[in-house]
Amino acid sequence: MLFYITVTVLLVSAQAKFYTDCGSKLATVQSVGVSGWPENARECVLKRNSNVTISIDFSPTTDVSAITTEVHGVIMSLPVPFPCRSPDACKDNGLTCPIKAGVVANYKTTLPVLKSYPKVSVDVKWELKKDEEDLVCILIPARIH
């Protein structure tokens, strides 16, 4: 019996992701990557005065012709906007719009971690939106260092 419990715990741990889905309504998130951090990390350490690259593989459940990006740092339940270099996700982010339903798309962009950011723990909320509705919504636990 102890063997089965141990195997179950190991399988669940092996499948653990460093991000959580916070309401992806119009797409299925396939994978998320953050430069320099493995998927089994508990949090991402973001160094101030540097850049971090994020990639999100997803498949929309509906045809999509335009996607906007919103990024927030959530500190004590308060969302603080992060600067987004390209809010139009269909430009310079690896996406070719329109995207057909069921087709896996790869979004990739770079986020500046400004020197002015305080050294705090934060949940990075990354949203890709279609007509103000969440196509993709993920939360990434991070620590700004």
UniProtKB/Swiss-Prot annotation:
Coiled-coil ranges from the UniProt annotation: none
Keyword Disulfide bond applies: yes
GO CC, one annotated term: extracellular region
List of glycosylated residues: N51
Keywords: Disulfide bond, Glycoprotein, Secreted, Signal
UniProt cross-references to SMART domains, sorted A to Z: ML
Signal peptide range in chain numbering: 1-16
Disulphide linkage map: C22-C137, C90-C97
Record bears the keyword Membrane: no
Matches recorded under PANTHER family: NIEMANN PICK TYPE C2 PROTEIN NPC2-RELATED, NIEMANN-PICK TYPE C-2C-RELATED
GO molecular function: sterol binding
Name of this protein: Ecdysteroid-regulated 16 kDa protein
Subcellular location: Secreted
